[in-house]
């Protein structure tokens, strides 16, 4: 399934799992660095994305890779590709 997902077009993001309470769903926090338009200083921006986790294999604190996918529910538009690091 992950090879099929990686061949799709769409954004690929890396983030940390902050919630895994829902069945087959994880919430991933993604941090990006953006330059402030006026101050020219780099600011850390955080977004939360709801992603599909079909085997319920992720835990809180895991570093994961997610990819854009078709809408699966009202808020779920991302799919888990792989777990890069397991939390201790």
From Swiss-Prot:
Cellular component GO terms, alphabetical: cytosolic small ribosomal subunit
Keywords of the record: Ribonucleoprotein, Ribosomal protein, RNA-binding, rRNA-binding
Protein's UniProt keywords contain rRNA-binding: yes
Species this chain originates from: Nitratidesulfovibrio vulgaris (strain DSM 19637 / Miyazaki F)
The family this protein is said to belong to: Belongs to the universal ribosomal protein uS17 family.
Family matches, as InterPro entries: NA-bd_OB-fold, Ribosomal_uS17, Ribosomal_uS17_bact/chlr, Ribosomal_uS17_CS
Listed Pfam families: Ribosomal_S17
Domain of life of the source: Bacteria
Protein name: Small ribosomal subunit protein uS17
GN (gene name): rpsQ
Gene3D superfamilies noted in UniProt: Nucleic acid-binding proteins
GO MF annotation: an example: structural constituent of ribosome
Subunit (UniProt): Part of the 30S ribosomal subunit.
One GO-annotated biological process of the protein: translation
